[in-house]
Amino acid sequence: MKLSRFGKKFSALSGIGQLMEDLGQAMAQGDMIMLGGGNPAHIPEIEKVFRHSMEAIMQKAGAFESIVGNYDNPQGNAAFTEALARLMNTNYGWNIGPENIALTNGSQTAFFTLFNMFAGESEDGKRRKILFPLAPEYIGYADLGLEADTFTALKPEIEFLDAPFFKYHIDFDRLQIDDSIGALCVSRPTNPTGNVLTNDEVQKLTALAREAD
């Protein structure tokens, strides 16, 4: 059996794969307190809401059968995306509709799609990258690019606080967004350090991205 480049890349050992395998093995060996890996805590109040909703689905005629047996819109369940748009508009003052929302099978799938939409070879022959304006970043991003050299990053400015604490910031003096950059990506809070970009930093990034678009 001969694999394509895609097949070799996605069947190879990856950082996020090792991390999730380690977490899975740890959970299988007994009670553990999950502090990362996407499972930070079981919150009884939230689980109670989910349980109540699941019970309501099971009791409603045809609802369970529809979920397990009917295809939804590729964008996501229409009723759910409409409800989610209303929630965002009501709670955050946004002005979006269902057409602005797409559902995926988790964040890895979402970022795989986004990264490869904006990075790689374009129709004009130009190769563009995803820029992380702050590093270190989430290990799970590393293997999501279909092409080599999908990502580039900028070293941070480090602010030393009272020992032993420090905080790192975007080095805007060195940040350049030219035609080789397809998109910016930041985690807030940053994984794995928990560093949070300030509102001012986010606004500056947004302005720079608009200028470069």
Report the location of each language-model feature.
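Conserved core of the PLP fold type I
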Residues: 66-212
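N-terminal "arm"/small-domain region of PLP-dependent enzymes with the aminotransferase-like
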Residues: 1-76, 86, 90, 179-180
